[in-house]
Regions:
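PLP-dependent aminotransferase class I/II
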Residues: 20-21, 118-204
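Active-site phosphate-binding strand-loop segment of PLP-dependent enzymes
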Residues: 31, 39-101
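Helix C-cap/helix->beta junction micro-motif
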Residues: 26, 86-87, 116
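Substrate-binding/gating loop at the entrance of the active-site cleft, primarily
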Residues: 11-28, 157
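Phosphate-binding glycine-rich loop
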Residues: 1-8
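Conserved PLP-binding catalytic core of the aspartate aminotransferase-like
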Residues: 184-185, 195-232
Length: 234
């Protein structure tokens, strides 16, 4: 974000507050394009493109998204990024949760970095590899000029030897990758099935390691559900 120094940013929301915080340091204006509940929080690409006509130069997407657990399919991403390329809009896609998607290849934008120079994809080890304390992340872009400029301004010693060693071991541990996907995806499907049996909840399609619910019982709050989970009632 600092290297791109955007002037007018659109954020696909609701989502992390950290994007907004980082943008505040760069001086960019920022607005949200909110996913709609009536669409199960899936993106209307054509509608978003109409909004992007209003002079934005930077677009931020979390895919799969937190907190909706919804995802944008790769073909829709291609259409969106191509539109942005024609409008000189740079697209940043955070794929922190992509390893939890039922079909990673259907969701990831990484292959699109070979097609578009206005794209950067971010990933990390905090969620799937359960290592938030490592503070280890990486970016993928096909824009060599942009990459060179980022390297010029890279903080010295931004990756320590422990992080480099652990990160390599994590990303090459294919057995962990397979077993973790089997466990999380299996448990998520089981949870979705059981929750759908309860009329008090509306269950939205999930692509991350969490499920978004709408409470449909009058007087029942999220705090009540939380306490029921803690004491084993639910």
């Amino acid at each position: 974000i600092q290297e791109r120094a955007p002037k007018h940013t659109l954020i696909l929301g609701p989502t992390y507050s950290e994007y907004s915080r980082e943008l505040s340091f760069s001086g960019s204006t920022q607005e949200y394009y909110h996913l709609q509940e009536e669409r199960n929080f899936t993106l209307d690409v054509d509608d978003l493109c109409k909004i992007l006509e209003k002079g934005y130069d930077f677009l931020i997407i979390c895919n799969p998204n937190n907190p909706t657990s919804s995802a944008i399919m790769q073909e829709d991403l291609r259409k969106l990024i191509a539109f942005c390329a024609g409008k000189n809009i740079f697209v940043m896609i955070d794929e922190t949760y992509v390893e939890f998607a039922p079909d990673i290849n259907a969701v990831t934008a990484v292959p699109l970095t070979r097609e578009f120079s206005n794209l950067m994809v971010l990933r990390g080890v905090s969620k799937f590899y359960a290592a938030p304390g490592m503070r280890l992340g990486y970016g993928i872009t096909g824009n060599r000029e942009f990459l060179a400029k980022m390297k010029e301004k890279q903080t010295p010693w931004s990756l320590n030897s422990l992080g480099a060693f652990a990160g390599k071991r994590m990303l090459l541990d294919h057995d962990y990758f397979r077993r973790t996907r089997e466990l999380i995806l299996g448990e998520r499907d089981r949870m979705e099935t059981e929750l759908k049996k309860l009329p008090i909840f509306k269950v939205y399609p999930a692509y991350a390691n969490f499920i978004l619910l709408k409470i449909q019982k009058e007087g029942l709050t999220s705090a009540d559900v939380f306490e029921a989970c803690i004491d084993g009632t639910l």
